Amino acid sequence: MSTATNENKLRHHAEQQFAEELEELKKSDARQRPANWELSPWAVCTYLLGGELDNGFTVSAKYIGNRRIIETAVATLATDRALLLYGVPGTAKSWVSEHLAAAISGDSTRIIQGTAGTSEEQMRYGWNYAELLSKGPSRAAL
């Protein structure tokens, strides 16, 4: 079985697709950052909502909607609290979570997805079935 090359991907991860914007934000961001964050809360909001930096670089908007929703989400994540995005299908929850993870940690694969019926126990203690099938029972498969 071969691994997918760049040509075979339908879409790159957010941190790859928008690498130039993330790098420009890092360079121009002198604001205080929470521990282990790549960008400040201001820069994370700018990354998602778009805007022009002091150096003239334009950051494209990833989310078109109520600015306050993004600001509240970023403020929540800047504390020690978790963030749960919920709503009807097709309202950009997965898209926003991917871009929040990319801007905050530099790794957009650090998200957990579930449905309204997914319990906390299932998220915390369930198996990663792809990992389980490929490598057998292990800590990585938990």
Q: Model-derived features: where do they sit?
A:
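AAA+ P-loop NTPase catalytic core and its hallmark functional loops
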Residues: 2-142
